[in-house]
Design a protein with these regions (language model features):
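Membrane-spanning helices that line or support transport/gating and their immediate boundary helices
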Residues: 19, 23, 30-37, 80, ...
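Transmembrane alpha-helix signature in integral membrane proteins
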Residues: 1-24
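Loop-to-transmembrane-helix entry motif
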Residues: 3-11, 38, 42-48, 88, ...
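Generic hydrophobic transmembrane alpha-helix motif, especially the helices
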Residues: 40-76, 83-84
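Short helix-to-coil transition segments within interhelical loops
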Residues: 85-91, 95-115, 155
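Membrane-helix interface segments
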Residues: 27-35, 61-64, 103, 158
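Transmembrane alpha-helices
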Residues: 67, 71, 104-136, 160-164, ...
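Glycine-rich helix-loop "coupling/hinge" segments at transmembrane-helix boundaries
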Residues: 56, 85, 132-169, 188, ...
Length: 196
């Protein structure tokens, strides 16, 4: 329960920010010019390489764990959202404008549906990545969670509990993937590639 809460909160913070900046940079050339190259530079730094800095900044409390997970899931969602927005057919947007659609209607009816397959790929990738990051984050002086349980069991050479921890991470990852696929099928039910 503690691990799932950390994963969900990290996904909401990092994923929400990634979605917002992906939409912003994908839609605005000025925002893209100002922000995208900086974000791409930061993306090349592995999230796990930030651990010493995160401990210096946030200590070893929940904020450090949340930050690591959020940074890790930010980039898959950001990149896929940015790419999805940029790859929407410009002719469809022009056609929408010629029909008198407002900017909000263009987003709702053309841009977001066109970018949705790419956005959901980013979400699915992030849902897999969140558990990897959480394993590492929970080894940073956690007092609860699967990572804490596993590290504690390692200290006492309890192989069975370590294996249970690994199995729990695998099951949570599988559950997250099933939820992502279900969400894909629901949100893309109009898309020919997702129809039964």
């Amino acid at each position: 329960q503690v691990s799932a809460g950390r994963a969900l909160l990290g996904l909401l913070v990092g994923g929400g920010l990634g979605l917002f900046l992906g939409l912003l940079n994908g839609s605005s050339k000025m925002a893209s010019t100002l922000l995208d190259t900086t974000l791409q530079m930061i993306r090349n730094i592995p999230a796990l390489a930030l651990i010493p800095l995160v401990i210096l900044w946030f200590g070893i409390d929940e904020t450090a764990k949340l930050f690591l997970v959020a940074v890790g899931v930010f980039f898959p969602i950001y990149i896929n959202t940015y790419h999805g927005i940029r790859s929407v057919d410009p002719q469809l947007i022009e056609m929408g404008k010629s029909y008198g659609l407002t900017r909000w209607q263009l987003y709702k009816e053309i841009i977001l549906p066109g970018a949705m397959p790419s956005i959901l790929v980013g979400l699915r990738f992030s849902l897999g990545l969140v558990w990897v990051l959480l394993i590492v984050a929970e080894t940073i002086s956690a007092q609860a969670g699967i990572g804490y349980m596993t590290m504690n069991a390692r200290e006492f050479l309890q192989t069975d509990i370590v294996l249970v921890g690994i199995l729990l991470y695998a099951l949570l990852g599988k559950l997250a993937d099933v939820l992502a696929v279900t969400l894909e099928k629901y949100l893309l039910r109009w898309h020919a590639g997702y129809q039964k």
